């Protein structure tokens, strides 16, 4: 195509990807990617003995030559990516993005870790793959904020497949046409519904690894000249017309404007707590309030001011959120996370267990927590928290957290 205006968004991004040199990636972006990579490696080890990891390992039927940190088995590339991605995301302690929550490290680090070993890549090649894939995931998240969640899909699962696809395409040195096709192909592989919220089941954990493996498959198909639609993003049946709520109009300028001169990857955040992204500011509020309460039994009620876009995932059904049925569902319950913050003063891996979801003192606090939608809340542009604790003597303790700790406002 001779005219840039005629190019589809996938072609524009693929052209930038193909031409990108390592020296063009800002140092602060490289530093952020390295931090995310190290964080992800730690999480692979942290979850290596969890039941869901054992279940995935036992499901594999093929062997290979790819290593998974913390495990003796050698796997084929796609299985290694699935296991690594699930391990990184499994405890919801991995990085997140402010704009629409997507978990970049669990997809990109699992994919490029396997690619690095399989293709014996040099460090700069790995970092280039991580950079382009991370940037695509972040920019796709900004095209139509909240729309994918509202439609019932997990943004990391859908958008992550594209990040992995272009990251692997970069290290394979796919041409612009091959990379564009790879993105078009992976659009038919992307999937991941949020019905796990209903009963706190494990499927969300699987999403990043599956997205990464889809990226691996699609990039290799593109490398061998299998054709995919170049209008996979903006087309009539593209992902934003298939996986996103039509009431939220996509802004495709977010995908390509300032490409190369502004890096959204630099806005990736490291979570302080092992639970859902939007629970984090409320835990900070709870920990601050804890210092002002002599006895947690003095609490009469707790009212939280929240963004409307968080309610369907983290607050409703309120009966389930006040009494989570599994340790995993507890990670996506703001009432439980607040109660944990008040009770323990922290919210790490050991605060979300079978023992704690049955802890009567924690559940008693949960039963007192409710929410009000705040029209002024900036979600998803900013992740903030506000709680008002009413004590039995009518004293009110108000705490706010203006932004996500580990994010752009509180790095």
Residue ranges of each PLM-predicted region?
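Hydrophobic alpha-helical hairpins/lids featuring a short glycine-rich hinge
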Residues: 87-142
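Amphipathic alpha-helical interface segments
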Residues: 107-109, 152-171, 181-254
